[in-house]
Amino acid sequence: MTISLGFVVAEFNRDLTYQMELLGREHAEFLGATVKETILVPGVFDMPLAIKKLCQREDIDAVVTIGSVIEGETDHDQVVMQHAARKIMDLSLEFNKPVTLGIPGPGMTRMAAHERVDYAKRAVEAAVKLVRRL
C-alpha cells in the first residue's frame, strides 16, 4: 500500500519553508509515500481550513504541516503557534486521520529556524508511521 500525503505549507518565511518542503518530499519518497497534493497558505495561522480540505479527501491518508514561526517584537509567535497546534490536533481527531506538526517555534530566532528545517522530515516520518500503525 502506497501512503498518500497532503502537504500544507506556509508561505510566510518561504525561504525556510521551501527548503522544508523539499526535504519533506524527498523523505516521503525515501519512505515509499507519495505527496498527492500541496496547498500553500499565507501563514501557519491560516492552515486549519486547508488541513480540513485535505482531511476530507478519501485519497489522502495523512496531512503534513510545514511552517516556521519566528520570534518577533511581541508575543505574536506564541499566540500563533499555540492556536495553530491546538487546531491541528483537533482536526486530526475530528477526521481520525494523522495530521503532523512540521512547524518549529515559537521563541525561535531566524538562525535557529535554519537549523530546524529537518522538522519537515520528522513530520513526514511521523505521518507515515501513524498511517502504518493505526
UniProtKB/Swiss-Prot annotation:
5-amino-6-(D-ribitylamino)uracil binds at residues 12, 44-46, 68-70, 101. The keyword Transferase applies. It holds the Pfam family DMRL_synthase. GO terms for cellular component: riboflavin synthase complex. GO terms for molecular function: 6,7-dimethyl-8-ribityllumazine synthase activity. SUPFAM superfamilies: Lumazine synthase. Keywords: Riboflavin biosynthesis, Transferase. InterPro entries: LS, LS/RS, LS/RS_sf. Its EC number is 2.5.1.78. GO terms for biological process: riboflavin biosynthetic process. Pathway: Cofactor biosynthesis; riboflavin biosynthesis; riboflavin from 2-hydroxy-3-oxobutyl phosphate and 5-amino-6-(D-ribitylamino)uracil: step 1/2. It catalyses: (2S)-2-hydroxy-3-oxobutyl phosphate + 5-amino-6-(D-ribitylamino)uracil = 6,7-dimethyl-8-(1-D-ribityl)lumazine + phosphate + 2 H2O + H(+). It comes from the Archaea. It is an enzyme of class 2 (transferase). (2S)-2-hydroxy-3-oxobutyl phosphate binds at residues 73-74, 116. Belongs to the DMRL synthase family. Catalyzes the formation of 6,7-dimethyl-8-ribityllumazine by condensation of 5-amino-6-(D-ribitylamino)uracil with 3,4-dihydroxy-2-butanone 4-phosphate. This is the penultimate step in the biosynthesis of riboflavin. This is 6,7-dimethyl-8-ribityllumazine synthase. It comes from Methanosarcina mazei (strain ATCC BAA-159 / DSM 3647 / Goe1 / Go1 / JCM 11833 / OCM 88).
